Amino acid sequence: MFQGQRGWFCGSVSHDLRQFWVAEGGTISDPRAADFLFSCDASHPDTLRIYQSLDYIEDNATVFHAYYLSAVANAEIKNSVALGHFILPPASLQKEIRRKIGSFIWEQDQHFLIEKHDEVTSNELKVFRESSVLATDHKKDLSKSTEKHFIRTPVVEKQMYFPLQHYPVNNMVTGYISIDAMKKFLGELHDFIPGSSGYLAYHVQNEINMSAIKNKLKNKY
């Protein structure tokens, strides 16, 4: 599933989920070299350093909730779990997002919260690996197809994703208002290009010094 992919894990992520990542072919690296950044706590110092980094401010980095790995482990078809549903925003934004839309996908069932009680256990990892071998052997006998599906009997049968037509209301990824709820504008539209017409766009966290951000961005122009 994660063969050849590099992941960074915040200190808030359990050992079992890290072990699951490695068991599925992934490797653990530092945040600068990682393909994926995982955390279970937006307020953890490790995660805060990511949010405060220039890479994050310039939209070159995204933090995902590690509950994604738990969802994959419990899904009947592991490729059916959409990573985009598990974007973890900074803690300063979460309250407003919840107020407008509701709970995040990893909060929708307390029984499955990985930071509580339902982490992927060593026994589950063993079952997962054994099932993966059986599924691979079965597919080799049936087909040469390059598409790889993984089937296992979940520990608890549960739908780990929601229909796209309800996104993002059910999956709580962005917090953006629906286009259907926006007022219609009948005038002439023009593209907004940061840096033109005397305007610049900034993405700044509360903890970051605004002057330092401006100086770094001005050096680009």
From Swiss-Prot:
Q: What is this protein called?
A: Telomere repeats-binding bouquet formation protein 2
* Gene name tied to this protein: TERB2
* Subcellular location(s) per record: Chromosome, Telomere; Nucleus inner membrane
Source taxon at top rank: Eukaryota
| Pfam families with a match to the protein in the record | TERB2
Entry keyword Membrane:
yes
Q: What is its main location?
A: nucleus
User: Quaternary structure?
Assistant: Component of the MAJIN-TERB1-TERB2 complex, composed of MAJIN, TERB1 and TERB2.
GO cellular component terms, alphabetically, are:
chromosome, telomeric region; nuclear inner membrane
Annotated GO biological processes are: homologous chromosome pairing at meiosis; meiotic attachment of telomere to nuclear envelope; meiotic telomere clustering
Record keywords? Chromosome, Membrane, Nucleus, Telomere
Q: Which family does it belong to?
A: Belongs to the TERB2 family.
Query: Briefly, what is this protein's role?
Result: Meiosis-specific telomere-associated protein involved in meiotic telomere attachment to the nucleus inner membrane, a crucial step for homologous pairing and synapsis. Component of the MAJIN-TERB1-TERB2 complex, which promotes telomere cap exchange by mediating attachment of telomeric DNA to the inner nuclear membrane and replacement of the protective cap of telomeric chromosomes: in early meiosis, the MAJIN-TERB1-TERB2 complex associates with telomeric DNA and the shelterin/telosome complex.
Instruction: Please tell me whether the keyword Ion transport is annotated for this protein.
Output: no
Biological source species: Bos taurus
